[in-house]
């Protein structure tokens, strides 16, 4: 029968017959590479026979036959006809998956079009396969389309390596977890001011130790004050409050510092006073030593400030030979 069809160019009839027979062996026979009529037959399967059927099993056997014959480009033609041309199988999840995956393997230029046109595929799985095949823009497009925004920005940061685009994306979707991911990446690149802005937008103080270290190293004191004020609202950590006092001293916000230490807090005020003293920030040190009634250190600080009368008064309160000698 196949021979008669081939000899008389009855490829349309042959294609319909093969689709309805659902016989893998017959398919294997006609899809062999040495069949001189293979191309004409495939054209009729794609254009006519398969688009006429409404039987899922007929579609399944035909698709498997093309896969078994290792004809990825022809399989793409076949699946395009079924999935993209509004057939009854257009929304079939496995066929949509197969079309995209076959394109990833055989014709990468089509992948982006399929991703954008189709809506019913296994997005996270397909995106991860795209990543493993270095199709990063395609993976980003999938995650963005299905609103998996944390994964989308991860692709921009880790695979595409473009923090400017990551920032634009974070601005557009404006979700705290997305800002947090961006902030972590910015901090790793030593973009301290930008990282702090992102952490504040995320309302996420979790990386406070790394932020403090980076801000100390890069002298981002103004930004650090903003970050630690946000962090303090979320967690009354002793470390956060201690570093906030020091940052206020570094930015010369002495009235805010005085107000802070006068209220309830968990800060190590003595420790910050010593740091201020060592860095020559005597006005701040004076406020802090006064707050913890450390009259010996206060007397030394007042001497540095040239406030000798007050230094004598503090020396008297300290009642220490060493302090008297210094004064």
Map each language-model feature to its residues:
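Extended alpha-helical solenoid/arm regions of large eukaryotic scaffolding proteins
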Residues: 1-327
């Amino acid at each position: 029968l196949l021979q008669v069809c081939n000899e008389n160019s009855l490829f349309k009839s042959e294609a319909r017959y093969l689709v309805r027979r659902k016989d893998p062996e017959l398919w294997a026979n006609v899809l062999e590479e040495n069949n001189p009529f293979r191309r004409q037959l495939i054209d009729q399967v794609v254009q006519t026979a398969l688009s006429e059927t409404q039987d899922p099993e007929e579609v399944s056997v035909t698709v498997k036959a093309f896969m078994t014959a290792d004809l990825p480009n022809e399989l793409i033609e076949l699946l395009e006809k079924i999935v993209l041309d509004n057939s009854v199988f257009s929304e079939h999840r496995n066929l949509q998956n197969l079309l995209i995956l076959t394109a990833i393997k055989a014709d990468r230029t089509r992948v982006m079009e399929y991703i954008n046109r189709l809506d019913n595929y296994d997005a996270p799985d397909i995106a991860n396969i795209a990543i493993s095949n270095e199709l990063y823009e395609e993976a980003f497009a999938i995650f963005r389309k299905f609103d998996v925004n944390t994964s989308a920005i991860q692709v921009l940061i880790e695979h595409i390596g473009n923090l400017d685009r990551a920032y634009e994306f974070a601005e557009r979707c404006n979700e705290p977890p997305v800002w947090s991911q961006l902030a972590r990446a910015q901090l790793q690149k030593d973009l301290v001011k930008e990282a702090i802005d992102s952490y504040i937008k995320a309302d996420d103080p979790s990386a406070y130790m790394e932020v403090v270290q980076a801000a100390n190293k890069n002298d981002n004191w103004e930004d650090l004050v903003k970050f630690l004020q946000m962090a303090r609202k979320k967690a009354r950590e002793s470390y956060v409050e201690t570093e906030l006092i020091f940052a206020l001293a570094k930015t010369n916000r002495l009235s805010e510092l005085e107000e802070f230490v006068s209220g309830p807090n968990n800060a190590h005020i003595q420790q910050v006073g010593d740091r201020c003293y060592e860095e020559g920030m005597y006005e701040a040190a004076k406020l802090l030593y006064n707050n913890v009634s450390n009259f010996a250190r206060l007397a030394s600080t007042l001497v540095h400030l040239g406030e000798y009368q007050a230094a004598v008064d503090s020396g008297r309160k300290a009642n220490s030979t060493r302090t008297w000698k210094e004064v």
